């Protein structure tokens, strides 16, 4: 099988592991920078080019598309989809997951419990917005943020108003969310592949911080999750139509709450913490689904 990995940096842990796992299972792998792909969009003979050459058909494509290049990255992935390549996460699902507001609306519509969340455009609504989520302390998030960047804990109402006004001054879209104090700076990252949680870790914020992201200095340990948490993680990934997802869960007094669904979860922290070959599980999922029948069905 020929597999393309779409990534700006093939030296990153996740890309290297996916390449290694695919090669170990006998596949040919090429890592492509999506920003160096260019496309001929033609009803008679669509094609995709890379650094001066027309690319051959790939049986499958693994998108490792960063938030900053979501627009062009998903456009390149769509072109591969048009040509019959099986995507490990479809372009439309990635774009959907990158929109935090839309994601939360979809999850809420499916009855998945979330932290109480509000959004407003007008500065006149700031006070009501704070009251809507239960007052301070609360969390203010940039809709476009990632890896814990653009996330602020406002411990007082005055601080909340100041942060919201500052973000609005940057013409940024923001979410205001209740602070789950009982989570104590911890969350659970569930790695979902297909209809299975293949690994789970607890991420704990470093002392003096509340964000548990490993990129922000958090620590990780193996997590034992409940059946309810497992079912919620799978349902959240399915709601977003993602074959592979990192589902972040907060343990609140009222039950598990989904905080975020990540369409391109990093493998380093969770593989090194659990010792589980997640990259191999992702490749095996591709083997089961990137079939000749799929290629013919999609016109490749």
UniProtKB/Swiss-Prot annotation:
It comes from the Bacteria. It is an enzyme of class 6 (ligase). Mg(2+) 1 binds at residues 248, 260. Binds 2 magnesium or manganese ions per subunit. Mn(2+) 1 binds at residues 248, 260. InterPro entries: ATP-grasp, ATP-grasp_RimK-type, ATP_grasp_subdomain_1, RimK, Rimk_N, Rp_bS6_RimK/Lys_biosynth_LsyX. Keywords: ATP-binding, Ligase, Magnesium, Manganese, Metal-binding, Nucleotide-binding, Protein biosynthesis. Its cofactor is Mg(2+); Mn(2+). Mg(2+) 2 binds at residues 260, 262. Disulfide bonds: none annotated. NCBIfam families: PRK10446.1, rimK_fam. An L-glutamate ligase that catalyzes the ATP-dependent post-translational addition of glutamate residues to the C-terminus of ribosomal protein bS6 (RpsF). Is also able to catalyze the synthesis of poly-alpha-glutamate in vitro, via ATP hydrolysis from unprotected glutamate as substrate. The number of glutamate residues added to either RpsF or to poly-alpha-glutamate changes with pH. This is Ribosomal protein bS6--L-glutamate ligase.
């Amino acid at each position: 099988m020929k597999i393309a990995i779409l990534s700006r940096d093939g030296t990153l842990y996740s890309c290297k592991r996916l390449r290694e796992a695919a090669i170990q299972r006998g596949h040919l792998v090429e890592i492509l920078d999506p920003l160096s792909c260019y496309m001929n969009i033609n009803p008679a003979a669509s094609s995709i080019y890379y650094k001066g050459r027309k690319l051959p058909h790939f049986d499958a494509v693994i998108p490792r598309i960063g938030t900053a290049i979501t627009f062009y990255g998903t456009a390149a992935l769509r072109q591969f989809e048009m040509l019959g390549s099986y995507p490990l996460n479809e372009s439309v699902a990635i774009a959907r997951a990158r929109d935090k507001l839309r994601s939360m609306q979809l999850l809420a519509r499916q009855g998945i419990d979330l932290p109480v969340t509000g959004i407003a455009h007008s500065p006149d609504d700031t006070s009501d917005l704070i009251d809507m989520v239960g007052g301070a302390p609360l969390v203010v998030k940039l809709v476009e943020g990632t890896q814990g960047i653009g996330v602020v804990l406002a411990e007082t109402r005055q601080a909340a108003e100041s942060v919201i006004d500052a973000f609005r001054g940057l013409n940024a879209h923001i979410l205001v969310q209740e602070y789950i104090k009982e989570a104590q700076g911890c969350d659970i990252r569930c790695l979902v592949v297909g209809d299975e949680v293949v690994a789970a870790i607890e991420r704990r914020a470093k002392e003096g911080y509340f964000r548990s992201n490993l990129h922000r200095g958090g620590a990780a340990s193996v997590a034992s999750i409940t059946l309810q948490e497992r079912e919620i993680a799978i349902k959240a990934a399915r709601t977003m139509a993602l074959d592979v997802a990192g589902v972040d869960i907060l343990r609140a007094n009222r039950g598990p709450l989904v905080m975020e669904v990540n369409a391109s979860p990093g493998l380093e922290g969770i593989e090194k913490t659990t010792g589980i070959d997640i990259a191999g599980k992702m490749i095996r999922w591709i083997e089961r689904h990137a079939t000749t029948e799929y290629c013919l069905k999609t016109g490749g």
